[in-house]
């Protein structure tokens, strides 16, 4: 931990949020038990990662209760402090959010991962209406919003625990505001309070089973198939090459949302595992796909397109993999999305600095396997994170190509707002690095109802029944996780 003299020196350099860090051994705890001890209340989060579908990433992140957060809907933003609105803004929320983020000047913490605090939450799909290059084409009709969630919700994470799964250590981080009296001493006291919480045992919320329910499509199979046929008409007319329609399912779910996270991380470990408690609703997800990642001046997108179910035996698994890589439709769709990714990254990267570093490799998850590619670029001077978001949002894998025309068609055929689905969840650090996953394989739990939405990429030779089945396959992991909870994880 830095001394008071070092703290004062950093304040003199113009930093208005200074981290105090304490390192402890926590090898007898898991990220879940630490979340239960330190967080487990509204406006907290747990973020984990599984690399290559097989091993947990080195770091896990637990956000302690956030006193400040932003909610945006349409052209309005509310800033909350301890549950009360303390600031409001009318207009495009994106410049305001960037300016809000930039209010905080912090020194970097050596020897820790790139994320050590900042904005954490989501940008829902309807964020698209705030980008000028989309706004003049999209109608933004007043669609039903049955989930009732904000378009954007971001928490200001100033107290967090970073777990090093390799060393078994935990880094407790508390940011102090040097403009406040006795801020250094109060931050040290807060760290001691957190240490006290760590020493206490936590009540384990056992999952003993509940009423078993089924997921029901709110769109319906036949209406969805009719939309696939309509999209194919647009494709044959030359309007577009691909569109990704989606359908939402819902099921009664009265269990603890954290139990769903437990089941999902076991059943479908993915590069982005996340649990957000937003008070009146929860987001629980296991996304395989980056929307965009910024690390200093590098930017990365990682399109995923092409899906097969996992085999029941190694031989069947290999056969499904070979079948996927030899499927001309799947390959054509994937190549189109690589090109779209190159175009998106190219808009914000230096000339000649865009490259495909992985091309059409297979990544395997619990229920499905995907074709995956990696597109990287070196950012132009002066590119902001909102410029990056504007260039890459929404993902081509959730909209289609050409992107704007595909989004117009989605706007026409889908009866309700997408909400969080198809948007982005993740972190935007104080250091300006950003890591956002696409909000897929993601459940929203609100008012004892679980919502899960999934889509399918429709091209010229798509079969409506197959595309409907693809939406079922993509939702299967979350639905099965919910059913595991209802059967009882701890019986």
From Swiss-Prot:
Its EC number is 4.1.3.27. Gene3D superfamilies: Anthranilate synthase. The keyword Aminoacyl-tRNA synthetase does not apply. Mg(2+) binds at residues 333, 470. Heterotetramer consisting of two non-identical subunits: a beta subunit (TrpG) and a large alpha subunit (TrpE). Binds 1 Mg(2+) ion per subunit. Feedback inhibited by tryptophan. Belongs to the anthranilate synthase component I family. GO terms for molecular function: anthranilate synthase activity; metal ion binding. L-tryptophan binds at residues 49, 271-273. One of its GO terms (biological process) is L-tryptophan biosynthetic process. This is Anthranilate synthase component 1. Chorismate binds at residues 306-307, 421, 441, 455-457. Its cofactor is Mg(2+). Pathway: Amino-acid biosynthesis; L-tryptophan biosynthesis; L-tryptophan from chorismate: step 1/5. It catalyses: chorismate + L-glutamine = anthranilate + pyruvate + L-glutamate + H(+). Keywords: Amino-acid biosynthesis, Aromatic amino acid biosynthesis, Lyase, Magnesium, Metal-binding, Tryptophan biosynthesis. Part of a heterotetrameric complex that catalyzes the two-step biosynthesis of anthranilate, an intermediate in the biosynthesis of L-tryptophan. In the first step, the glutamine-binding beta subunit (TrpG) of anthranilate synthase (AS) provides the glutamine amidotransferase activity which generates ammonia as a substrate that, along with chorismate, is used in the second step, catalyzed by the large alpha subunit of AS (TrpE) to produce anthranilate. In the absence of TrpG, TrpE can synthesize anthranilate directly from chorismate and high concentrations of ammonia. It comes from Neisseria gonorrhoeae (strain ATCC 700825 / FA 1090). SUPFAM superfamilies: ADC synthase. InterPro entries: ADC_synthase, Anth_synth_I-like, Anth_synth_I_N, Anth_synth_I_PabB, Chorismate_C.
């Amino acid at each position: 931990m830095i001394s008071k003299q070092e703290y004062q020196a950093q304040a003199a350099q113009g930093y208005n949020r200074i981290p105090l860090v304490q390192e402890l051994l926590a090898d007898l705890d898991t990220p879940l038990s630490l979340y239960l001890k330190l967080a487990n209340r509204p406006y907290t989060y747990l973020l984990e990662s599984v690399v290559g579908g097989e091993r947990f990433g080195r770091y896990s992140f637990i956000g302690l209760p956030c006193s400040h957060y932003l909610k945006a809907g349409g052209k309005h933003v509310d800033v909350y402090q301890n549950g009360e609105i303390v600031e409001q803004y009318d207009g495009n929320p994106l410049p305001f959010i960037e300016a809000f983020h930039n209010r905080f000047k912090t020194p970097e913490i050596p020897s820790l991962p790139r994320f050590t605090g900042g904005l954490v939450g989501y940008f829902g799909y309807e964020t698209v209406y705030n980008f000028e290059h989309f706004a003049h084409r999209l109608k933004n009709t007043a669609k039903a919003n049955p989930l009732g969630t904000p378009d954007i919700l971001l928490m200001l994470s100033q107290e967090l625990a970073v777990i090093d799964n390799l060393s078994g250590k935990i880094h407790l981080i508390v940011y102090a505001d040097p403009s406040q009296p006795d801020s250094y001493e109060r931050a040290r006291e807060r760290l001691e309070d957190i240490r006290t919480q760590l020493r206490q045992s936590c009540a384990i919320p056992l999952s003993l089973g509940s009423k078993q329910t089924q997921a029901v499509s709110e769109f319906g199979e036949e209406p969805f198939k009719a939309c696939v046929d309509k999209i194919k008409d647009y494709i044959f007319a030359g309007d577009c090459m691909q569109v990704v329609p989606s359908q939402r399912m819902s099921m009664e779910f009265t269990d603890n949302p954290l139990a769903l996270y437990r089941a999902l991380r076991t059943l479908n470990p993915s590069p982005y595992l996340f649990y957000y408690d937003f008070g009146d609703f929860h987001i629980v997800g296991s996304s395989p796909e980056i929307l965009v990642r910024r690390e200093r001046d590098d930017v990365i997108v990682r399109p995923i397109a092409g899906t097969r179910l996992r085999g029941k035996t190694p031989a069947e698994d290999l056969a499904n993999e070979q079948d996927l890589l030899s499927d001309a439709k799947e390959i054509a769709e994937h190549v189109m999305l690589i090109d779209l990714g190159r175009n998106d990254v190219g808009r914000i990267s230096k000339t000649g600095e865009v490259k495909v570093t992985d091309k059409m490799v297979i990544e395997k998850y619990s229920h499905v396997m995907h074709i995956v590619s990696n597109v990287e670029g070196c950012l132009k001077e002066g590119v902001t994170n909102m410029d990056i978001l504007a260039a890459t949002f929404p993902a081509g894998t959730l909209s289609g190509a050409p992107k704007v025309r595909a989004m117009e068609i989605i706007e026409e055929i889908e009866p309700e707002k997408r909400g969080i689905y198809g948007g982005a969840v993740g972190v935007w650090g104080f250091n300006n690095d950003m890591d956002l996953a696409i909000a897929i394989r993601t459940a929203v739990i609100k008012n004892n109802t679980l919502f899960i939405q999934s889509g399918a990429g429709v091209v010229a030779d798509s079969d409506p029944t197959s595309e409907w089945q693809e939406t079922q396959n993509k939702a299967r992991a979350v639905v099965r996780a919910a059913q595991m909870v209802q059967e009882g994880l701890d019986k």
